[in-house]
């Protein structure tokens, strides 16, 4: 008795480049579909509901168009404010005398500054602990 196996590979038969381009196109469409687009294409909302939503969110009905939805480069400002994370003194006390000069080095924090998208100013996090202080606590 012979058994025949049907090879169902699904997406594996489609070239990788096509899969990637298809994914990128659908991702870009989904990512740029904003609340404005939801309001424009939602037929179940009455005119009064639309007006109240526009007033509460500060959106204008004339700007809600899918052609005006922002693409990736327009989401972020071209020039970020000049933000310098604090310079912390990195002190290291080695157990052996082999690495004596390591303790005298000064190292900048490698953290990425968080920018408030509305004001485009550096966000200040309350209760944030620097990485050097966190290491000392452990």
Curated annotation (Swiss-Prot):
InterPro entries, per database record: DUF4452 (IPR027915)
UniProt GO cellular component terms: cytosol; nucleus
Domain of life: Eukaryota
Main location, first listed in the record: cytoplasm
Pfam family of the protein (one): DUF4452
Modified residues (Phosphoserine): 110
Tagged with keyword Phosphoprotein: yes
Localization: Cytoplasm; Nucleus
Keyword Cell cycle tagged: no
UniProt keyword list: Cytoplasm, Nucleus, Phosphoprotein
Designated name of the protein: Uncharacterized protein C22H10.02
């Amino acid at each position: 008795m012979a058994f025949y196996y049907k090879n169902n590979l699904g997406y594996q038969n489609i070239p990788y480049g096509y899969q990637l381009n298809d994914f990128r196109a659908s991702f870009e469409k989904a990512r740029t579909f904003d609340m404005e687009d939801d309001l424009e294409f939602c037929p179940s909302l009455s005119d009064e509901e639309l007006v109240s939503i526009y007033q509460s969110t500060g959106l204008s009905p004339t700007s809600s168009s899918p052609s005006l939805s922002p693409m990736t480069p327009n989401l972020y400002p071209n020039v970020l404010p000049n933000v310098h994370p604090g310079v912390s003194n990195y002190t290291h006390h080695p157990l052996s005398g082999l690495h004596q000069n390591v303790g005298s080095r000064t190292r900048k924090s490698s953290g990425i500054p968080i920018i408030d998208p509305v004001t485009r100013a550096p966000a200040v996090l309350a209760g944030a602990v620097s990485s050097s202080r966190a290491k000392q606590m452990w």
